[in-house]
């Protein structure tokens, strides 16, 4: 497994499995979901996106400069140019948006849709936002539900909350979400944390994912532990429903699309 990373002005690229000697014909481009420092500090998390040696992977992370709507829009332009260069090198390109990355995918789609070798996939996308992008909303829900140790839970949540523009973007009723136009040709996965997925996570010692199931039930998210089903849903007939938490939705969804 080969790790390389390249810096752009508004995002950072982590190349995985990219080897000129292999000449892989397919590539997965994962749009920004986290800031680059998250991946720098958690190389293990990058490995979780890899499931096939015959595919190249390019994981993108926000740069800290994406702190305003203006810079967010500049990042979109930069990613558009980047993807147009990438698809020249591969027979098939999967542009994947997980969580807030799905919003980015919607904003990029109209500019890239003419390229027939690109497949657009959204997973666990908060089209209507999520309370976890708003500390006050989380605090209010904890109080309403009278969750035990709610102060400790809130303090832990607040430590990992970035609060930068990408988080503000997916707050419920944000201006950006109102501007997003969804196209039904984007493959949309809706994830629901179920008891069976919880048991599977427990047996595989996936504590983080199992915890999301408990959070989903305790806070009545009614979704994947982070995003409600209502917020993820775009097209009732075409949406693909999967049993998974927010953390596990990518690997389950992408294996249904990529033909190995």
Which positions does each model-derived feature cover?
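Short coil-to-helix leader/linker segments, especially the first N-terminal amphipathic alpha-helix
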Residues: 1-16
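Active-site catalytic motif of lipid deacylating hydrolases and related acyltransferases
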Residues: 2-3, 18-91
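Short coil/turn segments at beta-strand junctions that form active-site/ligand-binding loops
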Residues: 25-26, 89-93, 116-118, 184
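A conserved amphipathic alpha-helix that caps or lines the catalytic cleft of carbohydrate-
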Residues: 47, 108-110
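Gly/Ala-rich beta-loop-alpha elbow adjacent to hydrolase catalytic centers
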Residues: 96-101, 105
């Amino acid at each position: 497994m080969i790790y390389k990373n390249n810096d752009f002005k508004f995002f950072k690229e982590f190349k995985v499995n990219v080897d000129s000697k292999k000449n892989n014909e397919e590539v997965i481009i994962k749009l920004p979901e986290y800031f680059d420092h998250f991946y720098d500090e958690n190389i293990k998390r990058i490995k979780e996106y890899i499931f096939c040696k015959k595919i190249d992977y390019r994981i993108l992370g926000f740069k800290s400069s994406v702190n305003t709507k203006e810079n967010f829009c500049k990042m979109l332009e930069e990613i558009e140019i980047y993807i147009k260069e990438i698809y020249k090198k591969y027979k098939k390109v999967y542009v994947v948006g997980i969580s807030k990355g799905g919003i980015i995918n919607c904003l990029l789609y109209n500019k890239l849709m003419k390229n027939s070798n690109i497949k657009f996939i959204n997973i666990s996308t908060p089209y209507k936002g999520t309370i976890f992008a708003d500390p006050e909303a989380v605090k209010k829900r904890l109080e309403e539900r009278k969750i035990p140790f709610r102060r400790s839970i809130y303090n832990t949540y607040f430590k990992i909350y970035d609060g930068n523009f990408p988080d503000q973007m997916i707050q419920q009723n944000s201006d950006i979400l109102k501007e997003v136009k969804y196209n039904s040709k984007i493959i949309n996965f809706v994830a629901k944390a179920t008891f069976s997925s919880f048991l599977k996570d427990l047996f595989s010692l996936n504590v983080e994912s199992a915890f999301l199931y408990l959070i989903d039930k305790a806070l009545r998210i009614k979704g994947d532990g982070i995003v409600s089903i209502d917020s993820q849903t775009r097209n009732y007939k075409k949406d693909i429903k999967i049993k998974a938490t927010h953390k596990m939705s990518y690997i389950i969804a992408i294996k249904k699309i990529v033909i190995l």
